[in-house]
UniProtKB/Swiss-Prot annotation:
Stored SUPFAM superfamilies: PRTase-like (SSF53271)
Subunit structure: Homodimer.
EC number: 2.4.2.7
Organism: Mycobacterium marinum (strain ATCC BAA-535 / M)
Recorded metabolic or biological pathway in which this protein acts: Purine metabolism; AMP biosynthesis via salvage pathway; AMP from adenine: step 1/1
One Pfam family cited in the UniProt record for this chain: Pribosyltran
Gene Ontology process terms (BP): adenine salvage; AMP salvage; purine ribonucleoside salvage
Lineage of source species: Bacteria, Bacillati, Actinomycetota, Actinomycetes, Mycobacteriales
Claim: Cytoplasm is one of the keywords in the record: yes
Coiled coil: none
Protein name: Adenine phosphoribosyltransferase
Protein family membership: Belongs to the purine/pyrimidine phosphoribosyltransferase family.
One Gene Ontology CC term in the entry: cytoplasm
Length: 184
């Protein structure tokens, strides 16, 4: 397990900033799910900068940052700009023109699939860090890893803003190295 004690806003650890600016929404998108709304975090200039700085320390030296749609892509784009790398958005099914590579997965509240372009990118041998907002069951990170490995990319790890430890997603995607900025 990778722990970070990164500071922002004076000396507050980034995990405290994330926790203070995350809104819990009960029964969304369906009953029994506790949704982590990171909108207040992303809208706060200083907190978002602290998150990106922490992720930049983790992803330094990577060739490409891959963000999982939609909130993971938002974070990945900011991170790629900070690192001076390219960014790849791993999209929800049906959002890209063909041909695409598709990977199916199960998530906390149903099955889904994700896609990347099949022929417009050369990823073979490139080091890629996957970025997502929340690690829950590990379904999306696992699928993203499988999808990128099919292209020949070298997935160096993943980083998430929030990890929901009770759902044991980290165990589901082992041995993928996962960095969490905060845990709930």
């Amino acid at each position: 397990m990778t722990d970070l004690v990164v500071t922002g806003r004076g000396s507050a650890p980034v995990a405290d900033l994330i926790s203070s600016l995350t809104r819990d929404v009960a029964d969304f998108p369906k009953p029994g799910i506790q949704f982590k709304d990171l909108t207040p975090l992303f809208a706060d200039r200083e907190a978002m900068a602290a998150v990106i700085d922490a992720l930049a320390d983790i992803a330094a030296g990577t060739d490409l940052v891959a963000g999982i749609e939609s909130r993971g892509s938002l974070v990945a784009a900011a991170l790629a700009a900070r690192l001076g790398t390219g960014v790849l958005s791993i999209r929800k099914s049906g959002k890209l023109p063909p041909p695409v590579l598709t990977e199916e997965y199960d998530r906390e509240y149903g099955a889904a699939s994700m896609e990347i372009p099949a022929d417009s990118l050369e990823l073979r041998g490139r080091s890629v860090m996957i970025i997502d907002d929340v690690l829950a069951t590990g379904g999306t990170l696992g699928a993203a890893t499988r999808l990128l490995k099919r292209t020949g990319a070298r997935v160096t790890g993943a980083a998430v803003v929030v990890e929901l430890t009770a759902l044991r997603g980290r165990e589901a995607i082992a041995p993928l190295r996962v960095h969490s900025l905060s845990r709930a």
